[in-house]
């Protein structure tokens, strides 16, 4: 009789288990020098000596912690995308990500962003679906001056990227919404105060995304950690804790810990979850290093047990689940807020604006007496504190800038990532393409728009990373370089259908072996929308129909 040899557990680089040896190149870079230290080199060395002086481990590693990615060299289509061609497609310019952390921006702040864009970024500016503003064509020589101007108005790019707590999602109407359970702004401010520029949290296993909102308006199910407003029958208003969300190539929705957290304890609980991720998170394979993989392997009960016993030293209060929302809360349009004034939400196509536009928005804000505005998680802009007698004036002025507050459903519900215009990871054009796709859909589907009981969301992403949240859209497109049917390859997309959040949370379905070329996007959306209207049952949503429809109907 032979004794079975014990199975050796693979070293996943979990610090809490004593596995401190770096197991991939990024972990080695972080160990060699703390990522936050690169700021001084940017200011004192690279900005003075130019792009060619930048050390590669800083350029492709630590720069991310300063909100900087090199952008794609112009003229290289999706066939060039891949690690083997990084040297060829990497331009000597940067995308700079400016985080907002749910803060309201004054007219002066908005104008400062506009001026930075026009002076240093060739008038580019994109509102991301993480409530950030992204600028392009940034030269390393200009970074210190841009930082100086941003920081003078309370903004920063620090840790807008990297293996660290990214910018925090907060409600665009935090403290203002008539429907919020509570205003969590103090908790967000305290989390940022504790975490930003803190070496204790600057070396997490992977990116770490947080949402804190008194409303379900921040896509909380797709975050690593999220706190959502909920009313406890005994304890009153507080927040419901979710962990383990994230999309990309292994999408997972966050799960409830079934606990109720009072507002003043949110920063402590957030730190405990973050420390747990730092210590127990996987650091061997980058593709398996997000918190969601740990939550999946442990299960939610073990996660809560370790959180309470090892990090909080107390038991959390059991809490009720918030009722899931039926429709996306995007804050587009005009609505009353708590102070009796109005919020006006507008919809640029897929978040694309410009420095010139932002400066003009600042002028309009001052003209109508508003001094607060926020980005949204759906690539929109909301202007707050607008008096009743100034709403029409503001709406007219914003319309003239291409920022409608009464947009078509297609404009309102289309999102896109950066795409091949600037992103080295992309296989397809996305944001630029939406600028013509949305008007095309408005024209082609005008005859059936009134038949849509609820709008159909369309999300375009240039690669599998799902920055534009394609798996939770009614119609999601994932960029690929595809066979054109004649032996050649062209830019195209894999189709995802029937995803959603809230009451219909799920990832929908992927059509097997069905790809759509970029030129066919309008045709495809037109075709599948009309088939839905022909084949739906009474009151049936697009997502529900898409999940049950024959695959042939969806092609």
UniProtKB/Swiss-Prot annotation:
Binds 1 siroheme per subunit. Binds 1 [4Fe-4S] cluster per subunit. [4Fe-4S] cluster binds at residues 417, 423, 463, 467. It catalyses: hydrogen sulfide + 6 oxidized [2Fe-2S]-[ferredoxin] + 3 H2O = sulfite + 6 reduced [2Fe-2S]-[ferredoxin] + 7 H(+). Gene3D superfamilies: 3.90.480.20, Sulfite Reductase Hemoprotein, domain 1. Keywords: 4Fe-4S, Heme, Iron, Iron-sulfur, Metal-binding, Oxidoreductase, Thioether bond. Its EC number is 1.8.7.1. Pfam families: NIR_SIR (PF01077), NIR_SIR_ferr (PF03460). Its cofactor is siroheme; [4Fe-4S] cluster. It comes from the Bacteria. One of its GO terms (molecular function) is sulfite reductase (ferredoxin) activity. The keyword 4Fe-4S applies. Siroheme binds at residue 467. SUPFAM superfamilies: Nitrite and sulphite reductase 4Fe-4S domain-like, Nitrite/Sulfite reductase N-terminal domain-like. There is a cross-link at residues 69-161 (3'-(S-cysteinyl)-tyrosine (Tyr-Cys)). Belongs to the nitrite and sulfite reductase 4Fe-4S domain family. Catalyzes the reduction of sulfite to sulfide, a step in the biosynthesis of sulfur-containing amino acids and cofactors. Monomer. This is Sulfite reductase [ferredoxin] 1. It comes from Mycolicibacterium paratuberculosis (strain ATCC BAA-968 / K-10) (Mycobacterium paratuberculosis).
């Amino acid at each position: 009789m032979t004794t079975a040899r014990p199975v050796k557990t693979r070293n996943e680089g979990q610090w809490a288990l004593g596995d401190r040896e770096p197991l991939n190149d990024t972990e080695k870079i972080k160990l060699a020098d703390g990522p936050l230290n690169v700021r001084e080199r940017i200011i004192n060395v690279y900005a003075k000596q130019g792009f060619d002086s930048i050390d590669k481990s800083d350029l492709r590693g630590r720069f991310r912690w300063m909100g900087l990615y090199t952008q794609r060299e112009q003229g290289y289509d999706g066939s060039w995308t891949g690690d083997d061609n990084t040297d060829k497609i990497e331009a000597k310019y940067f995308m700079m990500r400016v985080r907002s952390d749910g803060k309201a921006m004054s007219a002066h702040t908005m104008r400062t962003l506009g001026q930075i864009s026009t002076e240093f970024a060739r008038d580019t500016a994109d509102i991301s679906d993480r409530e950030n503003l992204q600028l392009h064509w940034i030269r390393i020589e200009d970074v210190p001056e841009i930082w100086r101007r941003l920081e003078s108005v309370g903004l920063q790019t620090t840790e807008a990227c990297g293996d660290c707590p990214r910018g925090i999602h907060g409600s665009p109407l935090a403290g203002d919404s008539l429907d919020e359970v509570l205003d969590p702004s103090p908790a967000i401010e305290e989390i940022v105060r504790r975490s930003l520029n803190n070496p204790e949290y600057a070396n997490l296993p992977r990116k770490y995304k947080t949402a804190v909102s008194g409303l379900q308006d921040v896509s909380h199910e797709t975050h690593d950690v999220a706190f959502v407003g909920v009313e406890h029958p005994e304890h009153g208003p507080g927040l419901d804790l979710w962990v383990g969300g994230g999309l990309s190539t292994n999408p997972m929705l966050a799960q409830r810990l079934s606990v109720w957290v009072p507002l003043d304890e949110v920063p402590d609980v957030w730190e405990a979850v973050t420390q747990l991720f730092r210590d127990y998170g996987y650091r061997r394979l980058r593709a398996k290093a997000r918190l969601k993989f740990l939550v999946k392997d442990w299960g939610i009960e073990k996660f809560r047990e370790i959180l309470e016993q090892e990090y909080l030293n107390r038991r959390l209060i059991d809490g009720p689940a918030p009722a899931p929302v039926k429709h996306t809360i995007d804050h587009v349009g005009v609505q009353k807020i708590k102070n009796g004034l109005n919020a006006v939400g507008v919809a640029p196509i897929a978040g694309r604006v410009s420095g010139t536009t932002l400066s003009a928005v600042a002028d309009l804000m001052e003209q109508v007496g508003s001094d607060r505005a926020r980005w949204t998680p759906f690539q929109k802009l909301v202007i707050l504190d607008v008096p009743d007698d100034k709403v029409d004036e503001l709406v007219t002025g914003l319309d003239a800038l291409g920022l409608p507050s009464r947009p078509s459903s297609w404009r309102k519900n289309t999102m896109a990532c950066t795409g091949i215009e600037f992103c080295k990871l992309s296989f397809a054009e996305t944001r630029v393409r939406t600028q013509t796709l949305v008007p095309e859909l408005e024209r082609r589907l005008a005859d059936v728009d009134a038949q849509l009981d609820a709008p159909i969301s369309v999300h375009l992403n240039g690669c599998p990373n799902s920055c534009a949240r394609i798996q939770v859209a009614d119609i999601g497109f994932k960029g690929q370089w595809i066979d054109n049917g004649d032996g050649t390859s062209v830019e195209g997309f894999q189709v995802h259908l029937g995803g959603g959040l809230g009451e219909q949370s799920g990832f929908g379905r992927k059509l097997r072996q069905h790809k759509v070329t970029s030129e066919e996007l309008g045709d495809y959306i037109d075709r599948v929308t009309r088939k839905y209207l022909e084949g739906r049952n009474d009151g049936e949503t697009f997502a529900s129909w898409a999940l049950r429809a024959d695959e042939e109907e969806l092609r």
